[in-house]
Every structure is written in structure tokens, then in C-alpha cells.
Amino acid sequence: SAYDRGGGGGAGGFRELKSPSTPYTASPLDGYSTPGNRITVTATGFPIAVGGGGAADNSPPYTVGANGSVSTFSTISSAGGGGGGRGCVGSNGGSGGASGSTGTGCTARAGGSGNTPPTTPPQGNNAGTTRDHPAYAQGGGGGATAVGGNATAGVGGPGGAGATTSINGSATTLAGGGGGGTDGDSANKGTGGPGGGGCGASGPYPGSSVAA
């Protein structure tokens, strides 16, 4: 089917602030030194919202998955990941969602933009580009520390890599982008980015998803 070619979804925005007095190894995206990022924690309540992944859209043609929802701690927000496109351009988000392709005669499309809205350090990266007729394949979604991979002939692009932090006591990689889908051979679907990105799908079958 022309509508089974979905781009990888982008990871949700990754933001980390580590005080120099805190004894753990932060990711390269530690924003503590950036003016305006710090929050003084006191013995009071803070608004907290834990975002989730966006839902797929299974109604062709030319559809795009929903973006993830925003996560918030006090005044600091991380954008939801951009939804992957299926026959259309992927969405912008914390990390961008990749575009999808459709029928014969289409041209390759760039993916959605990451770091949307912009933060310092960047909360995410752009998605990869599609590969259209005759060897359809889709780009990978952006990850926290790397862009999504571009599709090549019949091979889905890998999801962008996430960020590694030891905030929970051991090195953990978070916010990887989703792999791009393909037509045909399941061995050629895009791999999910390190940090939880789901693999792409081949043919009419659904890709994998992971918890936000």
C-alpha cells in the first residue's frame, strides 16, 4: 500500500540541569551554566507534568502521527516529540519527526525540525529525509544528541541517538528517535536510536513504540 511508509517519530525534548554540588555525571546537554535555566528548590509545591508519546494516525491518506505532550517542572518545559509523517511531512517538536512518502512520482522530503521551541542547550534534533520512488524508505526521527538518519534506497534511516546521564545512579540513555519505515524487506527497517527509540516498520505492519 502507498500509505504504509511512515517516518520515524522524534524523541521528546531532553533537558537537564545539574548543580556542581550534585555527585553524578550529567549528559552533554547539562544547561546549568546557561542564564535563566536554574530553579531554586524550596519546601513548597511545584507544578509538574509528565508528558507522553503521541498517538499514531491510521487513517490514510497523507496523515501524520500526533506529537507527544509537553513535560514540565516549574518553569522548565520539554516539548513533545514530533510525529512521524505518512505520505506527508513530519512534525516539529523536541526532536523532529521524519516525513513519509506516498505514490509514484513523489520527491524526497526533509523531516521535521527539532529544538522546537528553541532552548539552550538544544532540547532535540532534526529528523532525517525520505527516499522516494522507486526505492521507498523513510528517515529516522531526531534524538536528543543526534539528527535522525536519512533513508537510503529501500533502507529506513536510523533514529537519532539520545543523551546519557547518571542522574538515576547509573549511566542511562534517554530520548532516542524512532527508526524509519520501509516497503518490503523487514531487515531494512530503520533501527531505533539509542535511548528508547522504537524500530521502524516494513510493508503494512506497525512499527514498535516505547513508553515516554
Place the predicted regions along the sequence by residue.
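Low-complexity, glycine/proline-biased repetitive segments and flexible coils/loops
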Residues: 1-212
